Amino acid sequence: MAATAAERLFSLELLVDWVRLDSPCFASPAVAFRLLDFPPLLILPPAAPDPEPQRGAITFGRGKACLLRLRPAALRRPRLRAALLQLPAVPTPAPLLLGACDILLVPSVGQRGIFTLRGPEAERVGELALFYRLTDLGRFPPGAPQLRSPLSPACITGSEALEVSEPRTKETSKPCTKDTSARCLQCVSNGRFLEAPEPCAKDTDNWSAGDSDASAVQKSWEEAILHSKASSGDMASAPCSPAPSGRTVSPVSLEVTELDFETNTFCPPPLYYTHLTQEKAPSARVEITIEPQRNEPEDLEDAFPETKPVGPTIRPVKHTRAAIQESPPVLLNLPQMQGPGEANEAPCPPQTEQSTVGAIRQLPLLNALLMELSLLCNQPVANPSQVHPHLAWLYRGEHKGPDPSTKSTSRSESKSNKLSAQENEKLVSPQSTKNPKGKHSKISGSPPPKVTKGRLLYGLTNTLRLRLQQTNPGMLVVHEKREQYRRSQIRAVGPKFRIPSWKGKVSSLAAESQMPPQLPGDTLTDSNGKVSSWAVQSQLPPQLPRDRSLDSYGSFAEGSDTSMLISSGFDESSRTREAKQSHAMKKETVGQSENKTVTSLRAPVSPAVSVIPERSPRSNILRGKWKKQVQSPGLSRQDPAVDKAVGEGIDGKQVKAASAADTNENRPPSRKSSCESTSELQCWDGSTSPCYSEDFCTTENNSRSLPAPDSSTGAEYAQKGSWASKSSEARLSTRKNSSESSSVFTPPFSAGSPVCSQKRSRVLKTHDSLEEASSLSTSDFSSQWTNEKENQADPGSSKIRRRQDRSTKLKVGTGHKSSEKSHSARTSQVSSYEPSNLSELELKAIDDIDSASTGFQEEEDGLGSLRISRQCRDICELVINKLPGYTV
């Protein structure tokens, strides 16, 4: 008991870095270590050794560790014997000893060094790079059987077991329990223990550190090789006991494989992915997160049209609240992890809505970007409280519902009518389809409109026709029938009526809120019937059976009541113009032959004029609104008087180009005014040349861009007389006919374009190629004839025209921008797309507008919208203009 109580526990760790031999070896040698009379520890080289660190070196990079129970007196001069052995191919022959060395162990000190290996005759054979450490773990516990009980609860009774095996990983230390009676336990890195125990030869001549007998050393290494071969073959071990014990060997039971950590067995650390999946169990959370999207695809789609880029409205919050009630309350914190931009993409709960609004108010630049994107996407913010206080003045015009101006009121009404028409068309019975699921029990009123991904907004293009032929031929037939029906409706209504586009409506609300309210008659006849079309559109009931075409496809309303409203509004504007034209007939005494010739020239192209393509609301409101943005507030009341019916001489009458203002101001004709109008019309002519191919099918009438020149030239005539107006008016009428007959199919404008360009091509894709050729030749001839007649009437106009062409173009371009800056609330956002070198010109143009006469202002305002066609404001339009056949 005294001897047992004096024993201590030590830990021996060995790591072989590399071995280098002076003479090359045919096979990789093994390194064996032996301390005192313990069984040797064999370390085998790896199967695929690493690149040699030195010339002729063999990389090991592995080692072993074991626990020793010794008396302190046995380690007075502890020497570790290291031997380099050449292993045979088969376990029968004895291993060949290549070299050996002695290493002095110092307890509790770890050392790394290179030791010289010497052969049996003390010659140098190589070097061994080794790290070793002997650690004193303290006094061994008095109850020795307690350590032995988990090892062999039933089978190990007084006999000792030895297990020698090779670790599979680099520097993985495996414990080995030994004592003076030669008991050793060593585990493999992969956790497999002895499976086929086989007895080993008993060591009759025990080798110690001081032995020099070569035969005894050779027998001792043979014993180590037998153990190592058994372990390296199939992880089996050979239980043995050295000579001093004198006990019989008994096989170890298979229960040794059930060792746990209490036996000081070093096992590899558990892999994180094998345990975290069971602890976290994220499968339930994943189901909860995906569930609202899987069960309610309609609800999420319904929330998108109502969701504004700054903050969601109340309806998506209700939807989300109803959806979240079915899921655990853990998900209520998920939207808080989203950023301000992501929170706007999807509806968020009420508690996160306030935090999102607060975060947006702290980020004014982000707020401005979101507001600009909302305006460009035709989604004005409904709640002005979510706008940053410093930016509220920018978007004040976008949040107003009713406005004192009649135009703004009609636009807001038309917007609400469009929305209600969408809801009535797309969601006929929303409650009957969704309430059985229990999703919308809290929703009051009609749910938000459902987003339809296959909606045709820009007419039937060539690209869409080709896609539909491959994917859905049935829908292609439906779309072609709708195109034919729309064209027949347009022929019945007339060439002048157009549905305005969406961007002008958004951009001109703030500008028109500064204009005084107008009379109903003025509203109907303003700017060639564009406002009358607004009034008709705002009065359309949303319950029309065909009202979907007005909202989705941009054609005219396809009902009899709608056609009557459109025709009545058009006739009223026409009667107002006829009264003013008859009043101005007295001033028209010169140029009757010219007008007759113009009428005769217009006759051949009248069949092509009757085919007037429709326009979508998104691309149509733009044309009607740019003119109103450019005009100053003081000129808004003069629009009915300035308005002209240049293209109304189709019935054979004279071209009427004088207004009621001619009777008040009979200004003598001046060369400068005529030359200015001529140069401006030449600038307009530059944008009417055919530049597109026929790859686009959205047929659009060029006459949509005529209202601005009509009003501008009418203002010229009212101020400068009828003599200068006849030649330019004749040119206008012929050019209008040629452009009407030769308009081209243009692609839709991209929604991301801040300012949609007015540039359009002028070649109409008709089913009759002869009609197209005749219309083009007629337009060329008419423009050439008009230029010749003008040169005859005014011989000196060509020189002045060349001299003033540049200045007029400069004034037109800058005047449009300056007036747009002063009258549109949206230009503060679009100004980032303007060239930076125009600031001085814009300031100069503003001074010119303030100091010039009213007629000059009208010229600038009228033709300013034409200059917008000379600029490409968006990369999408550059692609469309330069690469025909591509739509964005």
From Swiss-Prot:
Signal sequence, start to end: none
Region entry Disordered, spans: 398-454, 508-602, 620-642, 654-683, 699-836
GO molecular function, one term: microtubule binding
Pfam family, one: HPHLAWLY
InterPro entries in the cross-refs: MAP10 (IPR039302), MAP10_C-term (IPR026679)
GO (cellular component) term, any one: mitotic spindle pole
Stretches with biased composition (Basic and acidic residues): 572-589
UniProt main location, coarse: cytoplasm
Subcellular location(s) per record: Cytoplasm, Cytoskeleton; Cytoplasm, Cytoskeleton, Spindle pole; Cytoplasm, Cytoskeleton, Microtubule organizing center, Centrosome; Midbody
Key word ATP-binding present: no
Keywords linked to the UniProt accession: Cell cycle, Cell division, Cytoplasm, Cytoskeleton
Bridged cysteine pairs (disulfide): none
UniProt keyword Cell cycle present: yes
Residue ranges, compositional bias (Polar residues): 524-541, 590-600, 661-683, 699-714, 722-745, 772-786, 825-836
GO biological process: cell division; cytoplasmic microtubule organization; mitotic spindle midzone assembly; positive regulation of cytokinesis; regulation of microtubule-based process
Assembly, per entry: Interacts (via middle region) with microtubules.
Role description: Microtubule-associated protein (MAP) that plays a role in the regulation of cell division; promotes microtubule stability and participates in the organization of the spindle midzone and normal progress of cytokinesis.
Name of this protein: Microtubule-associated protein 10
Species this protein is from: Rattus norvegicus
